Protein backbone atom coordinates (compact mmCIF):
# COMPACT_ATOMS: atom_id res chain seq x y z
CA UNK A 1 0.00 0.00 0.00
CA UNK A 2 1.35 3.42 -0.97
CA UNK A 3 2.14 5.79 1.87
CA UNK A 4 -0.02 8.88 2.28
CA UNK A 5 1.39 12.27 1.33
CA UNK A 6 1.44 13.25 5.01
CA UNK A 7 3.35 10.10 5.98
CA UNK A 8 5.92 10.66 3.24
CA UNK A 9 6.37 14.30 4.23
CA UNK A 10 6.89 13.44 7.90
CA UNK A 11 9.25 10.55 7.19
CA UNK A 12 11.37 12.70 4.87
CA UNK A 13 11.58 15.48 7.47
CA UNK A 14 12.73 13.07 10.17
CA UNK A 15 15.33 11.48 7.92
CA UNK A 16 16.64 14.92 6.94
CA UNK A 17 17.01 15.87 10.61
CA UNK A 18 18.55 12.52 11.62
CA UNK A 19 15.64 11.89 13.97
CA UNK A 20 14.10 8.78 12.44
CA UNK A 21 13.95 5.68 14.61
CA UNK A 22 16.81 3.31 13.64
CA UNK A 23 15.15 0.84 11.27
CA UNK A 24 16.15 -1.48 8.43
CA UNK A 25 13.87 -2.86 5.69
CA UNK A 26 12.25 -6.13 6.68
CA UNK A 27 10.72 -7.30 3.41
CA UNK A 28 8.04 -9.35 5.15
CA UNK A 29 4.29 -8.85 5.25
CA UNK A 30 2.55 -8.11 8.52
CA UNK A 31 1.39 -11.73 8.87
CA UNK A 32 4.84 -13.08 8.01
CA UNK A 33 6.36 -10.89 10.71
CA UNK A 34 3.85 -12.19 13.24
CA UNK A 35 4.71 -15.78 12.33
CA UNK A 36 8.45 -15.14 12.73
CA UNK A 37 8.04 -13.31 16.04
CA UNK A 38 5.80 -16.09 17.34
CA UNK A 39 8.46 -18.68 16.52
CA UNK A 40 11.18 -16.71 18.27
CA UNK A 41 9.02 -15.93 21.30
CA UNK A 42 8.23 -19.63 21.62
CA UNK A 43 11.97 -20.32 21.75
CA UNK A 44 12.61 -17.51 24.25
CA UNK A 45 9.86 -18.63 26.61
CA UNK A 46 11.10 -22.20 26.36
CA UNK A 47 14.59 -21.05 27.35
CA UNK A 48 12.98 -19.50 30.43
CA UNK A 49 11.70 -22.99 31.38
CA UNK A 50 8.05 -22.07 30.81
CA UNK A 51 5.73 -24.92 29.84
CA UNK A 52 4.02 -23.82 26.64
CA UNK A 53 1.71 -26.83 26.72
CA UNK A 54 -0.05 -25.24 29.70
CA UNK A 55 -3.35 -23.71 28.60
CA UNK A 56 -2.46 -20.37 30.21
CA UNK A 57 0.77 -20.10 28.19
CA UNK A 58 -0.01 -21.96 24.98
CA UNK A 59 -1.14 -18.88 23.05
CA UNK A 60 1.28 -16.40 24.64
CA UNK A 61 3.82 -16.39 21.77
CA UNK A 62 1.07 -15.56 19.26
CA UNK A 63 -0.43 -12.93 21.55
CA UNK A 64 2.95 -11.22 21.87
CA UNK A 65 3.50 -11.32 18.10
CA UNK A 66 0.12 -9.71 17.43
CA UNK A 67 0.67 -7.13 20.18
CA UNK A 68 4.06 -6.15 18.75
CA UNK A 69 2.98 -5.82 15.11
CA UNK A 70 -0.60 -4.55 15.46
CA UNK A 71 -0.41 -2.52 18.67
CA UNK A 72 2.58 -1.39 20.68
CA UNK A 73 5.04 -1.25 17.74
CA UNK A 74 2.56 -0.36 15.00
CA UNK A 75 4.21 3.07 14.67
CA UNK A 76 7.21 1.45 12.97
CA UNK A 77 5.06 1.09 9.85
CA UNK A 78 4.21 4.36 8.08
CA UNK A 79 1.20 2.65 6.51
CA UNK A 80 -0.32 3.15 9.98
CA UNK A 81 0.35 6.90 10.00
CA UNK A 82 -2.93 8.63 10.88
CA UNK A 83 -5.05 10.31 8.26
CA UNK A 84 -4.27 13.99 8.71
CA UNK A 85 -6.57 16.94 8.11
CA UNK A 86 -4.62 20.16 7.58
CA UNK A 87 -6.61 23.14 6.34
CA UNK A 88 -5.84 26.70 5.33
CA UNK A 89 -5.97 29.19 8.19
CA UNK A 90 -8.81 31.18 6.64
CA UNK A 91 -9.98 32.38 10.06
CA UNK A 92 -6.67 34.12 10.63
CA UNK A 93 -6.05 32.39 13.97
CA UNK A 94 -2.87 33.91 15.39
CA UNK A 95 -2.91 32.85 19.05
CA UNK A 96 -1.37 29.75 20.57
CA UNK A 97 -3.22 26.47 20.10
CA UNK A 98 -2.36 24.15 22.99
CA UNK A 99 -3.40 20.54 23.65
CA UNK A 100 -2.37 19.17 27.03
CA UNK A 101 -2.77 15.96 29.03
CA UNK A 102 -2.43 13.81 25.90
CA UNK A 103 -2.05 10.31 27.30
CA UNK A 104 0.74 8.23 25.83
CA UNK A 105 2.12 4.76 26.40
CA UNK A 106 5.37 3.82 24.74
CA UNK A 107 8.11 1.22 25.15
CA UNK A 108 11.71 1.81 26.21
CA UNK A 109 13.95 0.61 23.39
CA UNK A 110 16.69 -0.41 25.84
CA UNK A 111 14.70 -2.93 27.90
CA UNK A 112 11.33 -3.16 26.07
CA UNK A 113 9.33 -2.12 29.12
CA UNK A 114 6.67 0.55 29.43
CA UNK A 115 7.00 4.32 29.29
CA UNK A 116 3.81 5.89 30.62
CA UNK A 117 3.10 9.60 30.51
CA UNK A 118 1.41 12.66 29.05
CA UNK A 119 2.27 15.13 26.33
CA UNK A 120 1.55 18.82 25.86
CA UNK A 121 1.70 20.16 22.32
CA UNK A 122 1.27 23.74 21.11
CA UNK A 123 1.69 25.68 17.90
CA UNK A 124 1.17 29.20 16.62
CA UNK A 125 -0.94 28.99 13.45
CA UNK A 126 0.51 30.51 10.31
CA UNK A 127 -0.80 29.36 6.94
CA UNK A 128 -2.20 26.03 8.15
CA UNK A 129 -4.20 24.63 11.07
CA UNK A 130 -4.74 21.01 12.01
CA UNK A 131 -7.68 19.07 13.42
CA UNK A 132 -7.11 18.86 17.18
CA UNK A 133 -7.56 15.09 17.43
CA UNK A 134 -4.84 14.68 14.82
CA UNK A 135 -2.29 16.01 17.30
CA UNK A 136 -3.23 13.22 19.72
CA UNK A 137 -3.00 10.67 16.92
CA UNK A 138 0.46 11.84 15.86
CA UNK A 139 1.70 11.56 19.46
CA UNK A 140 0.27 8.07 19.67
CA UNK A 141 1.80 7.00 16.34
CA UNK A 142 5.32 7.88 17.42
CA UNK A 143 4.75 6.46 20.91
CA UNK A 144 3.90 3.10 19.35
CA UNK A 145 7.56 2.31 18.73
CA UNK A 146 10.55 1.27 20.79
CA UNK A 147 11.60 4.72 21.94
CA UNK A 148 13.76 7.00 23.98
CA UNK A 149 11.79 9.93 25.34
CA UNK A 150 14.12 12.55 23.91
CA UNK A 151 13.68 11.25 20.36
CA UNK A 152 9.93 10.82 20.76
CA UNK A 153 9.61 14.47 21.80
CA UNK A 154 11.62 15.64 18.80
CA UNK A 155 9.74 13.39 16.37
CA UNK A 156 6.39 14.87 17.35
CA UNK A 157 7.84 18.38 16.95
CA UNK A 158 9.32 17.75 13.50
CA UNK A 159 6.20 15.93 12.27
CA UNK A 160 3.97 18.87 13.16
CA UNK A 161 6.44 21.40 11.76
CA UNK A 162 6.42 19.52 8.45
CA UNK A 163 2.64 19.22 8.28
CA UNK A 164 1.86 22.77 9.43
CA UNK A 165 4.69 24.34 7.40
CA UNK A 166 5.91 26.37 10.37
CA UNK A 167 8.73 26.13 12.91
CA UNK A 168 6.48 27.54 15.64
CA UNK A 169 5.73 24.27 17.44
CA UNK A 170 6.46 23.13 21.00
CA UNK A 171 6.24 19.71 22.66
CA UNK A 172 6.65 18.65 26.28
CA UNK A 173 6.44 15.09 27.57
CA UNK A 174 6.30 13.99 31.22
CA UNK A 175 6.69 10.26 31.70
CA UNK A 176 7.47 7.43 34.09
CA UNK A 177 9.94 4.86 32.80
CA UNK A 178 9.38 1.32 34.00
CA UNK A 179 13.01 0.47 33.20
CA UNK A 180 13.69 2.76 36.18
CA UNK A 181 10.59 1.88 38.21
CA UNK A 182 10.43 -1.92 37.92
CA UNK A 183 14.10 -2.91 37.49
CA UNK A 184 17.60 -1.59 38.10
CA UNK A 185 17.40 1.27 40.58
CA UNK A 186 13.67 0.51 41.16
CA UNK A 187 12.69 4.12 41.81
CA UNK A 188 8.90 4.21 41.88
CA UNK A 189 8.47 7.98 42.25
CA UNK A 190 10.73 9.71 39.72
CA UNK A 191 9.56 10.98 36.35
CA UNK A 192 11.27 12.49 33.32
CA UNK A 193 10.41 15.71 31.48
CA UNK A 194 11.63 16.48 27.96
CA UNK A 195 10.90 19.48 25.76
CA UNK A 196 11.36 20.28 22.09
CA UNK A 197 10.90 23.91 21.11
CA UNK A 198 10.87 25.39 17.64
CA UNK A 199 10.64 28.84 16.12
CA UNK A 200 9.15 31.50 18.36
CA UNK A 201 8.85 29.04 21.26
CA UNK A 202 12.65 28.87 21.29
CA UNK A 203 13.53 32.46 20.37
CA UNK A 204 10.93 34.38 22.39
CA UNK A 205 11.21 34.04 26.20
CA UNK A 206 7.62 35.18 26.79
CA UNK A 207 6.14 32.64 24.36
CA UNK A 208 8.35 29.91 25.77
CA UNK A 209 7.28 30.76 29.32
CA UNK A 210 3.61 30.83 28.32
CA UNK A 211 3.94 27.31 26.94
CA UNK A 212 6.02 25.84 29.75
CA UNK A 213 4.31 27.46 32.70
CA UNK A 214 0.67 27.86 31.69
CA UNK A 215 -1.57 26.84 34.62
CA UNK A 216 -3.33 23.52 34.27
Swiss-Prot record:
Record SUPFAM superfamilies: Tetrahydrobiopterin biosynthesis enzymes-like
Which GO cellular component terms are attached? cytoplasm
Carries keyword GTP-binding?
Answer: yes
A Gene Ontology annotation in the biological process aspect, one of them, is: tetrahydrobiopterin biosynthetic process
Q: Does the keyword GTP-binding apply?
A: yes
Any idea which positions bind Zn(2+)? Answer: 108, 111, 179
User: What InterPro entries does the record point to?
Assistant: GTP-CH-I_C/QueF, GTP-CH-I_N, GTP_CycHdrlase_I, GTP_CycHdrlase_I_CS, GTP_CycHdrlase_I_dom
Q: If you read the UniProt record, what top EC class would you report for this enzyme, in one word?
A: hydrolase
A single GO molecular function term of this UniProt record: GTP cyclohydrolase I activity
A Pfam match is GTP_cyclohydroI
Q: What EC number(s) does this enzyme carry?
A: 3.5.4.16
Q: Which UniProt keywords apply?
A: GTP-binding, Hydrolase, Metal-binding, Nucleotide-binding, One-carbon metabolism, Zinc
> What pathway is it annotated to?
Cofactor biosynthesis; 7,8-dihydroneopterin triphosphate biosynthesis; 7,8-dihydroneopterin triphosphate from GTP: step 1/1
Q: Which reaction does it catalyse?
A: GTP + H2O = 7,8-dihydroneopterin 3'-triphosphate + formate + H(+)
Protein family per UniProt: Belongs to the GTP cyclohydrolase I family.
Q: How does it assemble?
A: Toroid-shaped homodecamer, composed of two pentamers of five dimers.
Full protein name? GTP cyclohydrolase 1
Source species of the chain:
Shewanella amazonensis (strain ATCC BAA-1098 / SB2B)
